[in-house]
Amino acid sequence: MQIFRADLLEGQICVVSGAGTGLGRATAVELASLGATVIGCGRRPEPIADTVAMIREVGGTAECEAMDIRDDEAVDALFDGVIERHGRVDVLVNNAGGQFMSPAEAITPKGFRTVIELNVQGTWQMTHAAATKAFIPQRAGKVVSVTLSPHRGMPGMVHSGAARAAVENMMRTLSIEWARFNVKLCAIAAGQFDTEVIRTKYPREVSENVARTIPLQRLGMPEEMAWMIAYLASPAGDFLSGCVITIDGARDNWFGPWPPPGATGESGEPLAEERRKPDA
């Protein structure tokens, strides 16, 4: 489905981390389809190369960089190379991240530190390098960082919750501090999306049960995340900075007992409590 004009991002240079799978791949493909040159990066070279091949097959322009966002020298080399080849960077999408589910009491110092380094330190290093090497000198640039939508706590994910909250506040703070350089920064709090990870890592029943906890009663499509990022990257997003946009089918607004709003029974009618009729 084509939402935007085909040349919306014509000539823009966009760096997308975690571009090898899921939301990152969908974002890279969408930005390239709108005319941007996409530099996709990630730790595993094969998935990144596959994304680049997909883009090139449909006539887009893309490059792949295998690197770890936690490695500050690799981050510097990434942006130095992009600027040497293209002269500038217009958009950075911080999509790379990761976590594992575990009871809080079972998380080791190493496990907690790893999640913080990947999600917070890595995001900071990518953002700082993009800003100091490109955005601040050219007095223009945009950063979109992908986080998670459960803002009221998610059991088993204390390390990830702490990390994602840090990234959101990082974007808010930098949006004020770097406004004088015309650098705009936003975060997108992502809910549950129908990516290859959820399709291949878990039984189908898991995704179905997850969808039932979403008021809109479905998982998001990766393209729906990509469309929002494309909007922010476009001139339409020029006055958006310092905000956290939640894309999760209203899941973050619901925290009450089962069933969630929107759930229906076999008849298709909304579920409701059977109440005793008053005596006649």
Predicted regions span which residues?
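Substrate-binding pocket helix/loop in short-chain dehydrogenase/reductase
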Residues: 103-104, 108-116, 210
